[in-house]
């Protein structure tokens, strides 16, 4: 996805100036997430808690409509659903840090699963979903401001999630986040 977006970017010309202004930040975040997940895959042992489950590709406000949509269902690690739900809470103004802490504390993941969860939280799927809609002309470019205006808050949210997971298992530090 990151490579494809870089390819598309060359063809933007001056059509998507606002999108282009923030693309480097989100591509960098995506590269961080990919590296974090690749490192977890290479260094951590999986156990029976890491089996594939039926997951949602995305969780959003239309969950009731997409719950049984086969195009929104994938086989993946359970951390996918958890990370999508945590992102949903943040971006839909339903964020309560006590609820997030309770969710994380209720998880029984392996170390690999927790690293995967945090790597997925780092990956800016929320940005790329809007990006695709803008490129496909189903959303206006100004929609990206909803994400951009929350960059600092989302970084604080990531720090909080990192700290909560670290109460259960020590994660490798993401330097720019500390």
Indicate where each model-derived feature is located.
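ATP/Mg2+ or Mg2+-diphosphate-binding catalytic cores
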Residues: 128-178
